[in-house]
Amino acid sequence: MKKLNNPAILVVDMLNDFVTGALACDRGKAIVPAMAQLLDAAREKGVPVIFCNDAHIAGVDRELALWGDHALAGTKGAEVIPELNVSSKDFIVPKRRYSGFFQTDLDILLRELGVQSVVMTGLHTHMCVRHTSADA
């Protein structure tokens, strides 16, 4: 297997509201143990772990009209699930749209960390993971 150059792990929307809450995804629960192992291994090797998460503004974000209230900034639903053990060395990038790159600090963070390869994981691959991948 080819070695990745300056990798980072990018975790998209592994939030309480998407795993067990307002927009729960039963299949999402199944990937949690393997994802937790991946993140622990990355941290042990010094690979940056970045969480890119929905953080909507109630009554403002248009997406809420489509999907209902979910991942409202500052609520428990917008927090990363506890099983992924967010570390003080991890990075959290809030987003208000499907793409983690649209009007966020994700691009500059990756550049400043010197990241050249990104391993993506997360929930709703047909939505936020897909849009973030396309914009990368």
PLM feature spans:
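Active-site acidic carboxylates
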Residues: 1-91
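Hydrophobic residues within alpha-helices
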Residues: 35-38, 106, 132
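Basic side chains
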Residues: 43, 95-97, 130
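Active-site environment of divalent metal-dependent phosphoester hydrolases
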Residues: 58-59, 100-101, 127
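Internal catalytic-core helix/loop-beta-alpha segment
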Residues: 81-123
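Phosphate/ribose-phosphate-bearing ligand recognition and processing surfaces
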Residues: 123-129
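Short Gly/Thr/Asp-enriched flexible loops that form oxyanion-binding sites at enzyme active sites
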Residues: 129-136
